[in-house]
């Protein structure tokens, strides 16, 4: 199975399955000299880990990261950074009934057809459990971007189902209260929406159902010049990385699909000697960063792992009923915020190193 790596100069490779012994990653291309320990990585892992609130899966994993290589005397050496996180709360018996059945909406069918077999225990490699190592690698990238270039990569949840936050709360990204975002389990900047989210998730959990979500990732203080036209555009690589997150079905850069209804006089980001007058482009022009905040929005589908009976087929293509008995999130978008932050940080650091390699 290919496709386990991302990046050129800053390259991340992950391995492991949902119910395996452990998950791990190799980070290549990290410059030497960055002060780094597990304590720098753990906070982001704690934001993502399961079992931390009543709104997410009850599966409990400590998600304690262990650095195996690439760090000496508390600093990166420039060699490959190896990390692992052990699985401790697998309940593989929950998946015995779907061993020969395909869960609708999951990768069960496509994995079986492509490879001739699949790890049915929690989805194996296709499980969002794999993203824990992306967050670990992304935490390293975020630290380097912040300490060496002042770049901040942060995200927030903007919609669950039909409930949306007040757009005025995030109209000026420089004024977003990030402390407020991280103070509630929904990563939501709008206090008035939190209570509505709470009520919705409670209802869904009682019904055994799930719901989709939308979240936004913002990178501030990104310098002008990141991105390689024509096929290595920064926005193209960001879209590729964000679409690679489990359950993501759409990616928008800047105003995204809203540009369809805009006129040229409205959409163009006019300039004055003092700077840009707007940021409809989301901080990227011609595939190259413009120096404005980079803004990307992703939409995540409702998980198909629900306790409502659904129709499917088995390995013999016979009709069967399927119900998922494992422990799952009623809204995967909640825990996706640190994952999306990680993917944006990985792409930005990769492009930053490529920029430094060829430009003054």
Swiss-Prot record:
Stated role: This reaction introduces a second double bond into the aromatic ring system.
Region of interest called Disordered, as start-end residue ranges on this chain: 36-60
UniProt cross-references to CDD domains, sorted A to Z: Chorismate_synthase (cd07304)
PROSITE patterns: CHORISMATE_SYNTHASE_1 (PS00787), CHORISMATE_SYNTHASE_2 (PS00788), CHORISMATE_SYNTHASE_3 (PS00789)
Protein name per the record: Chorismate synthase
Catalytic activity from the UniProt record: 5-O-(1-carboxyvinyl)-3-phosphoshikimate = chorismate + phosphate
The UniProt record lists the keyword Amino-acid biosynthesis: yes
């Amino acid at each position: 199975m290919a496709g386990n790596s991302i990046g050129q100069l800053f390259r991340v490779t992950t391995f492991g399955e949902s119910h395996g012994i452990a998950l791990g990653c190799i980070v290549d291309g990290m410059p030497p000299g960055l002060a780094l320990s597990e304590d720098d990585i753990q906070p982001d892992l704690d934001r993502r880990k399961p079992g931390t609130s009543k709104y997410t899966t009850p599966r409990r994993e400590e998600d304690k990261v262990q650095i195996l290589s690439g760090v000496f005397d508390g600093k990166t050496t420039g060699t490959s950074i190896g990390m692992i996180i052990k699985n401790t709360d697998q309940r593989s018996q929950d998946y015995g009934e779907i061993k020969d059945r395909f869960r609708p909406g999951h990768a069960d069918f496509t994995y079986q057809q492509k490879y001739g077999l699949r790890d049915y225990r929690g989805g194996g490699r296709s499980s969002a459990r794999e993203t824990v190592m992306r967050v670990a690698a992304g935490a390293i990238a975020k630290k380097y971007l912040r300490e060496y270039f002042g770049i901040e990569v942060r995200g927030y949840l903007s919609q669950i189902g039909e409930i949306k936050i007040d757009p005025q709360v995030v109209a000026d990204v420089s004024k977003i209260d990030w402390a407020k975002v991280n103070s509630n389990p929904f990563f939501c900047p709008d206090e008035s929406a939190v209570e509505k989210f709470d009520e919705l998730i409670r209802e869904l959990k009682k019904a055994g159902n799930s719901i989709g979500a939308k979240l936004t990732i913002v990178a501030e203080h990104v310098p002008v010049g990141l991105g390689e036209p024509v096929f290595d555009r920064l926005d193209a690589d960001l879209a590729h990385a964000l679409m690679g997150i489990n359950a993501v079905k759409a990616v928008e850069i800047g105003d995204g699909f809203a540009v369809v209804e805009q006129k040229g006089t409205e959409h163009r980001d006019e300039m004055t000697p003092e700077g840009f007058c707007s940021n409809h482009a989301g901080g990227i022009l011609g595939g190259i960063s413009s120096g404005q905040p980079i803004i990307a929005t992703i939409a995540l589908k409702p998980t198909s792992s629900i306790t409502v009976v659904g129709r499917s087929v088995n390995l013999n293509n016979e009709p069967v009923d399927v119900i998922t008995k494992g422990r799952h999130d009623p809204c995967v978008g909640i825990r996706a915020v640190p994952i999306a932050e990680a993917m944006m940080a990985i792409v930005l650091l990769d492009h930053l190193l490529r920029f430094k390699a060829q430009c003054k």
